[in-house]
């Protein structure tokens, strides 16, 4: 008799995705972050659901309702900080996941990669709207500044901004719709994740060597389920330590002041995970140019499969491109630091140089390095 997990219509899908899935035998711990992102998403939906039970999306009561959650709801403080810091964990895993894809050439599975870019945009949109909900100073001014960027769009910009605001400024209508979108988007993300996995399982997973691994596959369970559980335990250890010992470490003190449209904070900045893009936005003096650079900073990832010049997929055997890759990582860390600094000398020029370097490495230096390496290895 066939095992039920192989014959039942529903269990069969789970079996082919997480149990009997043929997986390359040599994938390293860098491949753990896909499952960690799944755990983060489940955690965010669960904690978010409980927060939504007590939160009110009204400008007069939003800030008080968050305070009420922290003070009066049983373990409300824990749920709130798990949700806030869970977002940080989500982005750490996301950046590593994308970075691993870039390093090992996983972007050559174009459908999976493009789906991942759509997911990245969706998660960033969700996180931005979530940051607005507590209705602190940084929530209000962050929402005002970022939504205002759309006014740079020629002809329809101003109308578009007022349409998104639901009025002539960020107000009750804006907060209500942001809450509605923040609630629905994670469920859309779950659907997108399923499509992402569908595309992934069409071609199978890549591996560190970048070579075809059809001849050397092992079942996902028990080998990689155990490996993933270890990753999950380490992630939870890190998250719980952060929540219990330094819950406000990654937050902004300004967000503990209720939103006041008449008082602008000295430094308006987003959460740490958006600082690199914010630095690129600020480094261009022109408003429309800045907005385009901001969008392109993520969208440039979609060009990677078309900019791949080497005959080798992975960077494992490509020292020149490896060096460029780590310079790019250092450059992104520099941009993250600059995004949190005031707009003054020397931060302006550092931000501009780091922004130029970011695009130059991806669009010019990496493709050139690929060709040089092929030449040196006599692979052309």
Curated annotation (Swiss-Prot):
Record Pfam families: Cytochrom_B_C, Cytochrome_B
Membrane topology: Multi-pass membrane protein
Superkingdom in the source lineage: Eukaryota
PROSITE patterns cross-referenced by the UniProt entry: CYTB_CTER, CYTB_NTER
Requisite cofactors: heme b
Phenotypic consequence of residue 334 to A: In strain: Isolate Eweb652
InterPro entries: Cyt_b/b6_C (IPR005798), Cyt_b/b6_C_sf (IPR036150), Cyt_b/b6_N (IPR005797), Cytb/b6-like_sf (IPR027387), Cytochrome_b (IPR030689), Cytochrome_b_C_euk/bac (IPR048260), Cytochrome_b_N_euk/bac (IPR048259), Di-haem_cyt_TM (IPR016174)
A GO term from the CC aspect: respiratory chain complex III
Similarity section: Belongs to the cytochrome b family.
Further facts: Heme 1 (or BL or b562) is low-potential and absorbs at about 562 nm, and heme 2 (or BH or b566) is high-potential and absorbs at about 566 nm.
Complexes and interactors: The cytochrome bc1 complex contains 11 subunits: 3 respiratory subunits (MT-CYB, CYC1 and UQCRFS1), 2 core proteins (UQCRC1 and UQCRC2) and 6 low-molecular weight proteins (UQCRH/QCR6, UQCRB/QCR7, UQCRQ/QCR8, UQCR10/QCR9, UQCR11/QCR10 and a cleavage product of UQCRFS1). This cytochrome bc1 complex then forms a dimer.
Primary role: Component of the ubiquinol-cytochrome c reductase complex (complex III or cytochrome b-c1 complex) that is part of the mitochondrial respiratory chain. The b-c1 complex mediates electron transfer from ubiquinol to cytochrome c. Contributes to the generation of a proton gradient across the mitochondrial membrane that is then used for ATP synthesis.
The name this protein goes by in its record: Cytochrome b
């Amino acid at each position: 008799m066939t095992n039920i997990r192989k014959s039942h219509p529903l269990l069969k899908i789970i079996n082919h995705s997480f149990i009997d899935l043929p997986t390359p035998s040599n994938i390293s711990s860098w491949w753990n972050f896909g499952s960690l992102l799944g755990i983060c998403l489940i955690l965010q939906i669960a904690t978010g659901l409980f927060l939504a039970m007590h939160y009110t999306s009204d400008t007069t009561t939003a800030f008080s309702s968050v305070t009420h959650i922290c003070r009066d709801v049983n373990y409300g403080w824990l749920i709130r900080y798990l949700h806030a810091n869970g977002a940080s964990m989500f982005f750490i895993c996301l950046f590593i996941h994308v970075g691993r894809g870039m390093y090992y050439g996983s972007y050559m599975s174009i459908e999976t990669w493009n789906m991942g870019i759509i997911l990245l945009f969706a998660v960033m949109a969700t996180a931005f709207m979530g940051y607005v909900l507590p209705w602190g100073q940084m929530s209000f001014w962050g929402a005002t500044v970022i939504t205002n960027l759309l006014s740079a769009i020629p002809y329809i910009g101003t109308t578009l901004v007022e349409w998104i605001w639901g009025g002539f400024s960020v107000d009750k209508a804006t907060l209500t719709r942001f809450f509605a979108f923040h609630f629905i988007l994670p469920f859309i993300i779950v659907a997108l994740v399923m499509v992402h996995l569908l595309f992934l399982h069409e071609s199978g997973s890549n591996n560190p060597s970048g070579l075809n691994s059809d001849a050397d596959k092992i079942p996902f369970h028990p080998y990689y389920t155990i490996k993933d559980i270890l990753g999950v335990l380490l992630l939870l250890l890190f998250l719980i330590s952060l929540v219990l010992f330094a819950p406000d470490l990654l937050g902004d003190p300004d967000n503990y002041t209720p939103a006041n449209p008449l008082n602008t904070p000295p430094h308006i900045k987003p959460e740490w995970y958006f600082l690199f893009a914010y630095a690129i936005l600020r480094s261009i003096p022109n408003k429309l140019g800045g907005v385009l650079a901001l969008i392109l900073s993520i969208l440039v990832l979609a060009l990677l499969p078309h900019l791949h010049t080497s005959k080798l997929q992975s960077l494992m055997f490509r020292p020149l491109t490896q060096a460029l890759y780590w310079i790019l990582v250092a450059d992104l860390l520099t941009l993250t630091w600059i995004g949190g600094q005031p707009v003054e000398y020397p931060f302006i020029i550092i931000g501009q140089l780091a922004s130029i370097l970011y695009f130059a490495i991806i669009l010019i230096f990496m493709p050139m390095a690929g060709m040089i390496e092929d030449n040196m290895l006599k692979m052309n």
